[in-house]
């Protein structure tokens, strides 16, 4: 039977595609050097240089093997002999490499090297440049066997293409640069996270692969805290009808009790089941809707759903079982997917404009990196008011962002971001804040910058549609998800119409703004 093929995308800061530090084993240390504590030397998956014949002591795989010696062929033989070959794949072996320091023998590699600026924080990487080695080690049972005691848990299920999108590890020797070509979070002193423009790169690469007809589905690997935003963005903008599954891990591959390897196996089973639920996350055997998926803590089992009304769609079982299906628009039904976005978005830049302003957001079917909107989040907390004057100028962060946005819009022809907006996280469920915040965000709205209001932290219900007519109510989305939907909405609808004096809009300018708010609200009510 021909196996189906799955695309495996490498995303940024991905613990699931990381490994523990390669520390020199005791077998690679001189007797006058620091010894690692413990009765056993640690082992690291490595490839053989040449074939070697080894003798394996009989009945040493389990304490009760000898107790059942009668069921073994030739039970009196002391050892089994086997030839190990390089093409077998990696074997767990002592790690004996040493760091060059100018001395004749070098020095052991240590975990502390990652904190030492004088040696370039160790000069090595432990993220995988793509998932190929990760998959090979899972198949080789380096970190555990399948339920039936065998290996090749991935290879038996499907074939794979490994696609570097915004990978966590990179080839510095080939000119790749951290923060531009790849995105690690360790060593922490030189960690980098993706830039806003990189979201367009991810969108284009994943979309082209997933629409190529070559794949049964795709797996996206990313950092556990930010996976939720990428998946919801993909759920909104990818016009696909096959499954994209996000996977993360709380512990690196190869570390004790790693959970990511199992999540990958389960993601493959979900894809091969043929169920199509849009973009989902698969963590700890549960299938999460991208819209409600959220990380709560860095321990296995601590992903949850937001919004207060569901979000776990099913379980991988076995068998894969789907209990609920998303009711909101996603992927091929989304109104903001890439196919439905115009090549040039048209909007009235000012309420009294006679003709629309247009901005090119796509080159053919590819999203332009420079048009990714800049959306900033503002939060309300009790006792934040400075006075009773509701003075917007007291909200210096909001006012500075408005000024920065207007300045960048004036330079959009030079490649500066043309779209800006705000997400306001207020009280639950009303999404209210201080009077000064309200007035500052009103100025933002009449400066052409869409504003969305959401409830605090992990909302348990929808924001009531009352209070601030100059802002969209963000349904039961949390602030991070509302930000992604606002970004996608701006690519479809453009900026809000500016007032000549944003502090004192005319009735006509208010009507123009409220019409724009309504168009945005329709998207937030259905996605």
Which positions does each model-derived feature cover?
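Active-site histidine-anchored catalytic micro-motif
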Residues: 2-527
């Amino acid at each position: 039977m021909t196996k189906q093929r799955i695309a495996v995308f490498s995303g940024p800061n991905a613990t699931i595609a990381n490994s523990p530090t390669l520390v020199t084993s005791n077998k690679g240390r001189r007797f006058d050097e620091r010894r690692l504590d413990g009765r056993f030397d640690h082992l690291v998956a490595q490839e053989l240089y040449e074939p070697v014949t080894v003798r394996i002591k009989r009945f040493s795989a389990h304490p009760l093997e000898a107790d059942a010696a009668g069921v073994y062929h030739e039970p009196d033989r002391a050892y089994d002999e086997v030839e190990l070959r390089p093409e077998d794949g990696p074997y767990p072996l002592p790690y004996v490499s040493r760091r060059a320091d100018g001395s004749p023998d070098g020095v052991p590699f240590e975990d502390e090297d990652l904190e030492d600026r004088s040696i370039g924080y160790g000069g090595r990487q432990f993220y995988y440049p793509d998932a190929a080695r990760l998959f090979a080690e899972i198949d080789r049972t380096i970190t555990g066997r399948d339920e039936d005691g065998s290996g090749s848990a991935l290879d038996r299920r499907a074939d794979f293409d490994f696609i570097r999108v915004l990978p966590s590890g990179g080839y510095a020797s080939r000119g790749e640069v951290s923060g531009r070509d790849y995105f690690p979070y360790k060593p922490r002193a030189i960690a980098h996270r993706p830039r806003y423009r990189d979201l367009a790169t991810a969108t284009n690469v994943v979309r082209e692969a997933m629409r190529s007809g070559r794949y049964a589905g795709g797996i996206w690997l990313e950092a556990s805290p930010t996976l939720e935003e990428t998946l919801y963005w993909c759920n909104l903008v990818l016009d696909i009808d096959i499954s994209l599954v996000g996977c993360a891990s709380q512990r690196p591959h190869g570390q004790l009790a790693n959970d990511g390897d199992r999540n990958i196996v389960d993601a493959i089973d979900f894809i091969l089941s043929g169920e199509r639920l849009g973009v989902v996350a698969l963590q700890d055997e549960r299938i999460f809707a991208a819209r409600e998926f959220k990380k709560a803590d860095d321990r296995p089992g601590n992903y949850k759903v937001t919004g207060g009304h569901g979000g776990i769609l099913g379980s991988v079982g076995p068998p894969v079982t789907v209990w609920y299906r998303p009711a909101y628009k996603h992927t091929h039904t989304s109104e903001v997917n890439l196919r439905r976005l115009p090549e040039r978005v048209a909007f009235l830049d000012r309420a009294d404009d006679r003709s629309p302003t247009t901005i090119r957001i796509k080159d053919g079917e590819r999203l332009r990196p420079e048009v990714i909107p800049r959306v900033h989040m503002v939060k309300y907390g009790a006792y934040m008011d400075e006075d009773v004057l509701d003075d917007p100028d007291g909200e210096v962060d909001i006012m500075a962002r408005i000024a920065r946005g207007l300045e960048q819009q004036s330079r959009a022809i030079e490649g500066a971001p043309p779209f800006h907006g705000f997400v306001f996280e207020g009280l639950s469920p009303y999404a209210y804040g201080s009077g000064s915040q309200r007035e500052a965000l009103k100025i933002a709205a009449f400066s052409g910058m869409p504003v969305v209001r959401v409830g605090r932290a992990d909302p348990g219900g929808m924001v009531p549609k009352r209070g601030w007519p100059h802002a969209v109510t963000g349904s039961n989305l949390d602030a991070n998800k509302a930000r992604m939907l606002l970004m996608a909405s701006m690519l479809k609808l453009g900026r809000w119409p500016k007032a000549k004096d944003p502090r004192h809009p005319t009735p006509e300018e208010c009507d123009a703004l409220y019409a724009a708010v309504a168009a945005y609200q329709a998207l937030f009510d259905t996605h």
